[in-house]
Amino acid sequence: MRAVIQRSKEASVTVANNIVGEIEHGLVVFLGVQASDTEKEIKWMAEKIRHLRIFEDDEGKMNHSLQDRGGKMLIVSQFTLYGDCRKGRRPSYSQAANPEFAKRIYDLFIEEVKKSGLEVATGIFQADMDVQLINDGPVTMLLDSEKIF
């Protein structure tokens, strides 16, 4: 499982000219699923993101997490996080999970985050989405459940 996490002042997802998810002050999480992902990866990723200390304290140090702040999370599926660009000019998505499996893992990830009490908004799986966000910082983090980076 991979995630690109962006701290944002506000963010929204629009599908067919309708806003389907939006947050103020929180994290936008672009989530990619691979075929080998299990409940272990779901729990690890949800816990890691909720507790990443990437919000500033009164002294300007990144010392608070989304969980500490009671912030919101906008979760957007993005299979292209598993695009492999090492060969040729067209990315290969062979490491990305098939849509049926990926949707199940994506939905379970959302439920895992909701269990923590955080407010969660989402995009629509496999939809053509317009994502708008105002980065805060900017602060962008990359996570991989296999700890590649």
Curated annotation (Swiss-Prot):
One Pfam assignment: Tyr_Deacylase
Reactions this protein catalyses: glycyl-tRNA(Ala) + H2O = tRNA(Ala) + glycine + H(+); a D-aminoacyl-tRNA + H2O = a tRNA + a D-alpha-amino acid + H(+)
Disulfide-bonded cysteines: none
Top-level enzyme category: hydrolase
Keywords annotated in UniProt: Cytoplasm, Hydrolase, RNA-binding, tRNA-binding
Ranges spanned by the short sequence motif Gly-cisPro motif, important for rejection of L-amino acids, renumbered to the chain: 137-138
A GO BP annotation: D-amino acid catabolic process
EC number(s) stated in the UniProt entry for this protein: 3.1.1.96
GO cellular component assignments: cytoplasm
InterPro entries per the UniProt record, alphabetical: Daa-tRNA_deacyls_DTD, DTD-like_sf
Subcellular locations according to the entry: Cytoplasm
Function in brief: An aminoacyl-tRNA editing enzyme that deacylates mischarged D-aminoacyl-tRNAs. Also deacylates mischarged glycyl-tRNA(Ala), protecting cells against glycine mischarging by AlaRS. Acts via tRNA-based rather than protein-based catalysis; rejects L-amino acids rather than detecting D-amino acids in the active site. By recycling D-aminoacyl-tRNA to D-amino acids and free tRNA molecules, this enzyme counteracts the toxicity associated with the formation of D-aminoacyl-tRNA entities in vivo and helps enforce protein L-homochirality.
Family to which the UniProt record says this protein belongs: Belongs to the DTD family.
Domains (record comment): A Gly-cisPro motif from one monomer fits into the active site of the other monomer to allow specific chiral rejection of L-amino acids.
PANTHER family in the cross-refs: D-AMINOACYL-TRNA DEACYLASE 1, D-TYROSYL-TRNA TYR DEACYLASE
Name of the protein: D-aminoacyl-tRNA deacylase
Native species: Desulfotalea psychrophila (strain LSv54 / DSM 12343)
Gene: dtd
